[in-house]
From Swiss-Prot:
InterPro entries listed in its UniProt record: DUF325 (IPR003225)
Name of the protein in its database record: Uncharacterized 16.2 kDa protein
Pfam families reported in the protein's UniProt record: DUF325
């Protein structure tokens, strides 16, 4: 359980974004980018975290717990593919249970990254580029080398 000082710090970082802490992948990615842009190495030392990524993850967790504690991501309106290997910190995530779509399940504990991306065929269409990108995502999801 984070201390009151850390909770205040985390919420102050995202004060202008708090209305956007919702169960939507794009908003969560924006939240992480906002937090990542505001934390410093001095903050890492001040709160005793092992790394910047761990601090960002903790800030993400505080904000989600305060502003959207019971929210779930509606996968009918969200991307349906995610990276099992984080593209930010290269940690491997557990595969989410098919019936658990809570926000916390899609945030990587190591760095707070949202492990959901757009389906490559939705982005590129059924082109060679789209198919190649889909194969790359599937390789990463299967735990292949980066």
């Amino acid at each position: 359980m984070p201390g009151a000082r850390f909770v205040r710090f985390s919420l102050r970082l995202t004060q202008e974004f708090k209305e956007n802490v919702v169960a939507h992948v794009d908003h969560l990615m924006g939240l992480r980018a906002l937090i990542d842009g505001k934390v410093t190495s001095a903050d890492v030392r001040r709160f005793g975290f092992l790394s910047r990524n761990v601090l960002v993850s903790a800030c993400m967790a505080v904000n989600v717990q305060v502003y959207a504690p019971d929210a779930t991501i509606d996968m009918r309106h969200q991307p349906t593919i995610y990276f099992r290997v984080c593209q930010n910190c290269h940690a491997m995530a557990d595969v989410p249970a098919p019936d658990d779509h809570s926000i916390a399940r899609y945030l990587l504990a190591e760095c707070g990254a949202v492990l959901v991306i757009d389906h490559p065929l939705d982005v590129f269409g059924e082109t060679e580029e789209g198919v190649n990108e889909l194969l790359e995502v599937q390789r990463i999801n299967a735990g292949g080398d980066l």
